[in-house]
Regions:
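Subtilisin-like serine protease catalytic core
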Residues: 21-24, 38, 49-85, 91-155, ...
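Catalytic-core regions built around general acid/base machinery
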Residues: 189-207
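Glycine-rich, charge-decorated loop segments at or immediately adjacent to ligand/cofactor-binding or catalytic sites
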Residues: 213-229
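Short acidic, glycine-rich surface-loop motifs adjacent to enzyme active sites
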Residues: 30-33, 161-187, 210-211, 300
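Extracellular S/T/G-rich loop segment that most often corresponds to the catalytic His/Ser-adjacent loop
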Residues: 66, 85, 225-308, 312, ...
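Secretory targeting and sorting signals
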Residues: 1-21
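Protease zymogen maturation seam
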Residues: 14-61, 71-77, 242-247, 402, ...
């Protein structure tokens, strides 16, 4: 496992055919509009009306713990990808450090905050050829935890959340997107991953999670969506102008169901040429710069963008208030069947949330102690590292996991699992010099991906 690598940078424009400040024909130029085009998604959730009022997510940074981000015009500019950290097994290789070799993280980043150079959100209704995410004014903090095949250990995700909490004030991180989940075999009240997301929530960060795509018979959300503090998002699919529960959607139970639903079927976002998803799923190809994917991952990214837009309009809202507004104003009649176990309070309506009075909202669920088993938190998702399965109470760093010691530590300056993240140096990097053709993927040997994508 490579040592932690951190980078902070203002990215210059990346030359991509079909999009430039001088000629904003856009990433989506010539691409037919579908229900999953972000041009339509922003209307489906009411975000465009907020854009015209100047609320585009500006002043809000969204952390994405995922597979990194790749060079794209819609993610260029000094105020777009404001920082990157690499906690993955690829961090030691300059050819892959920070970069998205799987294709998932870039797709999420585009949905949340992508923006073609020169595109003005206030005028975007007349320009369907522009690519704009839900919160085009927001910034992205990319925390890479997985490499070429998307596999990641739960201890890496916990470390990523730890890093986000430690740097939230410095980087103005108000939202955390976690399109990841495990089939943990223990209650959230002791699960270490649940403890981690609750600490982020209590630190003032709106945590948005994907519920999973295990089918309607699953009857249990993934972890950490199972934790009642966070915003658990399921996907909705538009067919013949009517919203349906996708066949692959996970179902909640009598204890915990999704909080709300958002568009999540065939969502068109940024493509990472040569990535695992791009190579293995050619059916997802839309254009040289765009790719489509389905899942609660995409739906969670839509809600993360909506949360950023809402916070740009009302920056004093707490995470509990953001959750209450988004769930209380969701359209409960939009999706059929109308079962709460599939779609929670209904389809996201951020425009209505933005105009609803600030609620008195304080969640008082039992909190996680984090004292449970790291192995149980993994569930069935295990990494294979150099031919050995990572299992038991051992972290990705090979150090023993002590839940009592970790849960009682002060995150502000404490070391995590024997490695000091706070002492890591920040280094500049230039995407323009990244070489994709020369990268070697043959050495990848991880298995057990848990990203909540139903299909590409």
């Amino acid at each position: 496992m490579a040592a932690l690598t951190v980078g902070a940078l203002g990215l210059g424009a990346v030359a991509v055919e079909g999009a430039s400040a001088a000629n904003p024909t856009g990433s989506a130029a010539g691409v037919p509009l579908t229900a999953g085009s972000l041009y339509n998604v922003v209307d489906q959730i009411g975000a465009r009306s907020l854009w015209t009022q100047g609320h585009t997510g500006q002043g809000v940074n969204v952390a994405i713990i995922d597979t990194g981000v790749s060079p794209a015009a819609a993610l260029s500019g000094a105020d777009k990808v404001v920082a990157m950290v690499d906690l993955s097994g690829e961090s030691g290789d300059p050819a892959t450090r920070f970069l998205d070799t799987y294709g998932h993280g870039t797709h999420m980043a585009g949905i949340i905050a992508g923006r073609d150079p020169g595109a003005n959100p206030a005028l975007a209704a007349a320009h369907p050829e522009w690519f704009l995410g839900v919160a085009p004014g927001a910034g992205i903090v990319s925390v890479k935890v997985a490499g070429r095949n998307g596999a990641v250990d739960v201890s890496q995700v916990i470390a990523g959340i730890d890093w986000v909490v430690q740097h939230a004030a410095q980087l103005n991180i108000r939202v955390l997107n976690l399109s990841y989940g495990t089939d943990s075999t223990q209650p959230y009240t002791i699960d270490p991953l649940a403890f981690a997301v609750e600490r982020a929530w209590k630190a003032g960060i709106v945590v948005v999670t994907a519920v999973g795509n295990d089918g309607k018979a699953a009857r249990e959300l993934s972890m950490p969506a199972r934790d009642p503090y966070v915003i658990a998002v399921s996907a909705a699919e538009q067919k013949n102008k009517k919203w349906k529960v996708p066949a692959w959607a996970s179902s909640g139970d009598t204890v915990r169901s999704p909080d709300l639903a958002a568009p999540g079927a065939s969502i068109v976002s940024l493509r990472t040429p040569g990535s695992f998803a791009d190579v293995e799923h050619p059916e997802g190809f839309v254009s040289p710069t765009l790719f489509k994917g389905s899942g609660s991952s995409q739906a969670a990214a839509v809600v993360s963008g909506a949360a950023a837009v809402l916070l740009s309009a009302r920056p004093t809202l707490t995470p509990d208030q953001v959750k209450r507004l988004l769930t209380a104003t969701a359209n409960g009649k939009a999706i059929t069947p109308r079962a709460v176990k599939f779609s929670g309070s209904g389809l996201l309506d951020v425009a209505k949330a933005a105009t609803t009075a600030t609620p008195q909202a304080t969640q008082n669920w039992p909190m996680s102690t984090g004292l449970g088993s790291l192995e149980a938190s993994r569930g069935s998702a295990h990494l294979l590292i150099n031919g050995t399965v990572l299992q038991g109470e051992v972290t990705i760093l090979g150090t023993p996991w002590n839940g009592a010691s970790w849960a009682g530590a002060s995150w502000a300056g404490a070391s995590w699992a024997g490695a000091s993240w706070a002492g890591a140096s920040w280094a500049g990097a230039s995407w323009a010099g990244a070489s994709w053709a020369g990268a070697s993927w043959a050495g990848a040997s991880w298995a057990g991906a848990s990203w909540a994508g139903a299909s590409w």
